[in-house]
Swiss-Prot record:
InterPro entries xrefs: BaculoV_Vp91_N, Chitin-bd_dom, Chitin-bd_dom_sf
Keywords from the named record: Chitin-binding, Disulfide bond, Glycoprotein, Metal-binding, Repeat, Signal, Virion, Zinc, Zinc-finger
Outcome when changing N468D: In strain: T3
Species name: Bombyx mori nuclear polyhedrosis virus
Variant or mutagenesis effect after changing A202R: In strain: T3
Gene Ontology CC annotations of this record: extracellular region; virion component
Residue ranges with Pro residues bias: 667-678
Gene behind the chain: p95
Name of the protein this chain belongs to: Capsid-associated protein Vp91
Record flagged with keyword Repeat: yes
Amino acid sequence: MMSGVMLLVFAIFLIIAFTLIYLAIYFKFDETTYTKRLQVMIEYIKRTNADEPTPNVIGYVSDITQNTYTVTWFNTVDLSTYQESVHDDRNEIFDFLNQKLQPVDRIVHDRVRANDENPNEFILSGDKDDVTMKCPAYFNFDYAQLKCVPVPPCDNKPAGRYPMDERLLDTLVLNQHLDKDYSSNEHLYHPTFYLRCFANGAHAVEECPDNYTFDAKTRQCKVNELCENRPDGYILSYFPSNLLVNQFMQCVSGRHVVRECPANKIFDRNLMSCVEAHPCTFNGAGHTYITADISDAQYFKCLNNNESQLMTCINRIRNSDNQYECSGDSRCIDLPNGTGQQVFKHADDDISYNSGQLVCDNFEIISNIECDQSNVFENKLFMDKFRLNMQFPTEVFDGTACVPATADNVNFLRSTFAIENIPNHYDIDMQTSMLGKIEMIKQLVSKDLSLNNDAIFAQWLLYARDKNAIGLNPLTGEPIDCFGNNLYDVFDARRANVCKDLGKSVLKTLNFGDGEFLNVLSDTLTGKDEDYRQFCAISYENGQKIVENEHFQRRILTNILQSDVCANIYTTLYQKYTTLNPKYTTTPLQYNRILVKRPKNIEIYGANTRLKNATIPKNATTISPVFNPFENQPNNRQNDSISPLFNPFQTTDAVWYSEPDGDEAVAPPPTAPPPPSEPEPEPEPELPSPLILDNKDLFYSCHYSVPFFKLTSCHAENDVIINALNELRNNVKVDADCESAKDLSHVLNAYAYVGNGIGCRSAYDGDAIVVKKEAVPSHVYANLNTQSNDGVKYNRWLHVKNDQYMACPEELYDNDEFKCNVESDKLYYLDNLQEDSIV
């Protein structure tokens, strides 16, 4: 007994030991690798053994991945691995016969590529030549996967039902792809299974209902003959979905036919006989039935034993409980019998493209592809203020799937498109001034990161001025004369149209001459400035520079004229600071044309000079001649001599002057009698330097070709004026509410809105420079820092820092110290041409 147990234990031990040894050998030994290496060695011996003996080690290419390959060296004695190395076939190739690596003399970029002429084939690029390889039958080469893949069962087949042959059963039901010849059974089909192909290329394996067989010719499920071996008159318990409530199936001559109950009777499917009753009497609530007077998409549903409700569906079906119900999706209604595919298209004034696809089968949605149509330019601003008025999608449908939208898969319907500017402080609408060219869109969606979007935008613009028009129709690109109540072009502000009849016709065309400019805030569109000579006109022909020239300045050196603010203020200051003793002057200083630079193109010459006190009274009855040679001349009693008729050295106390219009129409003055002898006068005090009003600088701040602000810099060429300016600037009067705007005093007529309904303006009141609070603010701004309503700084000469306001020429402004380094011999005056100069 004991010896038997020992033998059993020993046997078990041997079995376990043998199993372990076998498994160790099995896992260590790779039969496939052994076979490959044996074949490699045999092939090498066949080719070289006649010339030289078999070497101890042989190498071969054991693995290839694109341009990278692995060379495995093995011992010829036991086929064990000697070593492995990885190489790039673009640098070196392995010569099998010579068993060595050699430099390449033919660069191969793709070792494997598809054969464009036959999808079943692919091409291998060898070191010397190309080799064409074939995939198994019913397989095609897929370059993306670099392998042969099964041909889809619905490839090149329209939507519908197809019989299942042996190959389809193997691949779709048994899920096995066999490389065998199916031609011998190509006309044999499964009796109930069939292949359903959808419009999008998808497929499904379906089966006919019980008692039905798939007919390969009609591609429909047909009911099996149920009356075989049954007597005539036999009533079948078979109720097709289209059988009415008063119909039943009965056998006649071995075939089933549809029979109807007598009038006013229904067929009770429980009693299997015709009865005179309501269809709901025996079936109750929830029972469904159909009659001959309703459509194929309707049925009746019992509410109780006596009443029923007509139900209307997209598609009527019968469920597993043999009750009718609604199915289908309303989106499939437009397809024939609710089956097929519908490609969605988007089209607007600018572009068209496919946006998706709907695939339906029997009113059921098989697939619904909706590509991302969000506008790629939705939140993009160009040059910080322009939007492209175009709905360019993120994706389009290419026939199989959604792909990124490009200039190649989107159809452009027009050569131009509309551009809108964001709302601005002056309500300037620029959509009629310029349009975008389609080439702009093509470059913007090219995904070339090296391109600057703003530069592309500026490069591809069509301007109204290019067509010699005031405006362009944003939709058609054609020149227009009206667009609303008025029309103007900010890129060419020399003219504008005032329109009537809601923009249907032109009331009048304005051509702005000297002293006039486009005022976009005025109903008349006209502003007045005597100095303006279309200085903001854009002279660039380069379209990119035109749109980039948004804010710029024009500086003009010109003459001070009689009506200038420079002349008015400087004359007032001169009179105030040059008050003399009356006994030393015969007339007070008057401002006249001698004091200013004469206007250009007007030359005035004095033909003669005359005595100011020698004028002829208007009411004189007798006019004495200026020179009478027969008049008795007075004698000099002291030396008994006669005085000359004209003595150029004679002294007089008259003031000499020249009339502004010359002396051609003025008679010479009569000779004044010699003055009575007077005591020698006291010495005269030193007269002040003469008032000279000569030059001024004009600075125009332009928004494209529209002037917004004007800064006048009046040159002071008189010590009295310079000293007066210095005294005025050192004694500025500021209202308490305008303390934060006290530095407006550097520039007269400068305005700042400081919030809380307070507007401050600098002025000269004839006595001092004041910064006064306006009774009602001239302008109220939403953004105090920019003094505008859109966050854009238009006034380049008004500066805001830490809630403090300063007016100062840009070149004199020190932002770090918030200081204006005003020039002592200059007076500055600011005009808000758009908001303050409305005519």
